[in-house]
Amino acid sequence: MLDNDISTASALHHLSVPEAAFATGADAHALDRRRFLQLVGIGLGAGLVAGPGSSLLDTAFGNGDTSRAAGPIGAGDGILIVLGMFGGNDGLNTVVPINDSEYYAQHGSLAIPAGQTLPINRNTGLHPELTVLKEFWDNDQLAIVEGIGYPDPDLSHFNSMAKWMAGQTTGIPTSGWLGRWLDGYLSGSKDLFAAAEVGHSLPLHMLGESSWATAIPASRPSFGARSEERYQRQYQMVRNLSASSTDFWNRQIGQAFVDQLEVASEIAPAIPEELPSVDLVARLEVQARLINANLGFRVPSAGWGDFDSHAGQPDQHPLRMQELNGAIRRFYEVLDPAWTTRVTFMTFSEFGRTSQSNDGAGTDHGTTAPHFVFGSNAQGGLYGERPTLAGLGRWGRMAHHVDFRDYYGSVIDGWLGGGSSEVLNRSIEDLGLFASAPGGTAPNGPIPDEPTGPPGVSVVAGSNGYRPAVRLSVES
């Protein structure tokens, strides 16, 4: 039995592959998936982890078909970048109610003075570090959805994270909402490049019933991507193992590594050896470069934290906002501008924080929080309803006004081509978050050597100087 108050890291640990439990295949000779990942972890740790929708593990688990697609994105296809803010983000200090006296009374010393925020109207300001999002707002390309949550909220990291990742509030989740979208999108075909988690494991929301995303580390693949003669000899030995071995185990593991070699050879040219030192910045740069390479990725995802600021929030939260801002800026510095009408970002977190600060200069697990959808095709504005803070005591929690599944469904239908009712097993209320469908022609030219950035978003790094203890660099 899991402790209801396990840490953010522990919750992610249990809700990600390879730590999640896997059902073994019907083939009596098939490897247990968890054991397989342990056996080949050294090789995969330097390259990729993929699921049953890919040739990499399908072959290893005796599931047959080794075909996979690595093709350019289709005409009119949108690319959705999903950012997980793990630990529970303080929504009140992200989208600040600058004219609400209750906010300043309840948040106390944690509250951000109105004059230090980035105002978007007379009642609301963005966190002072979110300068890039302010630029999107000024271009009518930032949708802020306030009051997102679900009925009877759970304050456990694990339980609430599982609900948000699964896209369901009841039952034991066996798949995630984006994974189920991937099931429908692929319709049984094999495509390793349709969705990717830039990280070292696959979180629940990227796992479908029949298809999974691919996990790509925020680094250049080394296994399978080295050109030196001695490495090429080693790679050939692996190929020979798969081709000639009569031993089932050697043949299956060897074939999995052959797939790994082939995948690395396609991805490695898009990723430089030197990446930014800040983790989220590096992850979003990898995403931008994979999009530039036009391999067919529809849903790149990444998560970071820790946002679980029970103490020391004045030092922690500004850094998280600074990381987010720097990562988005770096993404658009690297992205070929021809892709901007194809890309939309969205954020999620398992819950918000309490309106009342605690004695440790922090906040505790809350319920509702605002989230962002932004990009050149987003319909800028405020959506949903800001929860009232009136009458909330020390352990009072804000009421939600937008079901998180309506938030998800609005993105699925408005940006990914539809199918929300199948993915979420319910009808949704469309929030109308998009001004236009994905547009523009995918570029066919070479990947740009130098970052350029899209029109309307400055590529000059910087911050307005709001009190973080450490300055972050987005340089390589």
Predicted segments, located by residue:
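Pro/Thr/Ser/Gly-rich low-complexity, intrinsically disordered linker/stalk tracts
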Residues: 445-475
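N-terminal export signals
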Residues: 35-62
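Active-site-surrounding "flap" and adjacent substrate/cofactor-binding loops of secreted or lumenal enzymes
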Residues: 76-79, 89-135, 139-143, 155-165
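Extracytoplasmic mature domains of secreted/periplasmic and thylakoid-lumen proteins
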Residues: 70, 123-229
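N-terminal secretory signal peptides
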Residues: 1-32
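Anion-binding catalytic surfaces of enzymes that hydrolyze or transfer phosphate/sulfate esters
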Residues: 239-335
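Structural recognition of the beta-strand scaffold that forms the well-ordered cores
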Residues: 82-84, 93-94, 143-146, 195-197, ...
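Feature marks hydrolase-like catalytic cores characterized by long aromatic- and Gly/Pro-rich stretches
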Residues: 2, 7, 96-97, 108-131, ...
